[in-house]
A protein has these predicted regions:
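Residue-level signature of the transmembrane alpha-helical cores
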Residues: 59-65, 69, 85, 92, ...
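Interfacial helix-cap and linker-helix signal at transmembrane-aqueous boundaries
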Residues: 17-18, 49-50, 82, 134-142
Length: 191
């Protein structure tokens, strides 16, 4: 939810952000683009990272780092630092959606997985719709920075709950040291 929400929550805040950093409004679109592109580039790495570090560990660290990147976005002192923080958000957030699906499937028995994915899908559908509404309210009532700070309690709670749930179930993972195809990654990124 948090990852998808962040793709649209700042859309209505772009003029406020542009005003704060004294940039042209059309430059503000880089805030959205930098996040989306970095997420798309790093999405193919999710499988490799999961094999190397495990699904639960990768999800928890992605969530925590995404939350920290959100904090950095909110604390941004310049437009370039905000762009850097958004790229970081995209990089670490790339694995959150596919891994949340994987974790969801491992929590439910086969006969309830359809229901679980239906509930999961509702959050993914609702988040982009609510993003501009929440972002507009937050920007008008507080500051555009709170569009990022809103992730702090959600991200920390999510990481903690996933850790507790899987630890209480005695979930164990296997890791394998696999090499990454650097040339393939470069070609994929350039494509």
């Amino acid at each position: 939810f948090m990852n998808v929400l962040d793709s649209t929550i700042v859309n209505v805040s772009l003029t406020h952000i542009a005003g704060d950093f004294a940039i042209a409004p059309n430059q503000g679109t880089w805030i959205i683009t930098s996040y989306a592109v970095s997420e798309a580039i790093f999405l193919p790495l999710v499988g490799w990272l999961t094999k190397r570090f495990g699904v639960v560990r990768q999800y928890i660290w992605s969530t925590i780092l995404f939350t920290l990147a959100s904090l950095l976005c909110g604390l941004s002192f310049s437009f370039n630092f905000l762009l850097f923080s958004r790229v970081l958000q995209g990089v670490v957030g790339a694995s959150m959606i596919p891994l949340s699906q994987t974790l969801m499937m491992s929590l439910y028995p086969k006969e309830k997985r359809g229901m679980a994915m239906g509930i999961w899908s509702i959050t993914v559908i609702v988040a982009p719709v609510l993003g501009p509404v929440i972002g507009g309210f937050i920007t008008d009532s507080f500051s555009w920075r709170w569009c990022f700070y809103i992730n702090l309690p959600i991200g920390l709670l999510s990481g903690y709950l996933v850790h507790r749930i899987f630890k209480s179930r005695g979930y164990t993972e296997t890791y394998e040291k696999s090499k990454i195809d650097i040339l393939g990654l470069i070609l994929l990124t350039l494509g």
